[in-house]
Amino acid sequence: GTLYTFRLLSKICDANGNVIEELTPEGEQIEGISQSTYDVMREGMYRVVHAAGTAAGAFTGLQIDIAGKSGSVQENLSRANHATFISYGPYNDPKISVTVAIPHGYMAYNAAVVCRYIYQYYFGYIDMEDILDKSYNTLGESATYSD
């Protein structure tokens, strides 16, 4: 496959919308991994969202069986960590991959909760009104929200 450098931009424009620079994807060809390595990675990602995994609390009772990996990125000591969560599901027949990155989101759990909403929305368990309703909580716990 191809391993691409992570980028959020495809081009840079001036204030009038004129393209200053096109940013072409940069990638390198990589060799595949062994089946045993793949199996270990897959099992590890499954454990992250189940039982005592680091993101299990965000996915308890989720209607779709998924696998994922949590992560926090430290930029510097004066700002909150970036929160990240990568995932795919359903676990045994993947249809979708979801990645959530929240700049200065404090901890990966916060990204995992957003990820849960995406899965529930994509597979039709909730709709946009549920997501926008601040009293709605997909975690099944009493929730308090403040603006």
Q: PLM features: residue spans?
A:
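Active-site beta-strand/loop architecture of penicillin-binding DD-peptidases
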Residues: G1-E28, R42-E129
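Short, highly charged C-terminal tails/helix-capping segments
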Residues: D130-D147
